[in-house]
């Protein structure tokens, strides 16, 4: 989880800047958890840039991995717009958005709250796909394997061609 010192930050920072705060191993682990591969032989800055471009190019990598509550949280970020912090009660376990370094978090320990800020480029990448991801999660609550996703895509394709 990437923490910030106050809520004066604006959301016009880049995802690669968030990744640069992490170690190279942490970045590789994030991408591995999303069932993708990134070479561990790259320099840290290149690893951060490549990981950010993978997520921004295919936001469904992340959206398919989130549970329904976190997808609703992403929808809140999308609807809130730029420079808007989403406030949640602190939990023992961070959200996946925090674990994957997709938000910067200010920890208000007195109020026991997290003030989360999502970079504009991440919010804009998620925006066109969030409703589809929520509908998909309603239909298939558990995470699907690559084989199951392929079968669903094939069935959808066949159904469209038979109509």
Q: Predicted regions: what is each one?
A:
Residues 149, 155-157:
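Interaction-mediating elements
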Residues 1-142, 152:
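Basic helix-extension-helix modules of the SAP/HeH family
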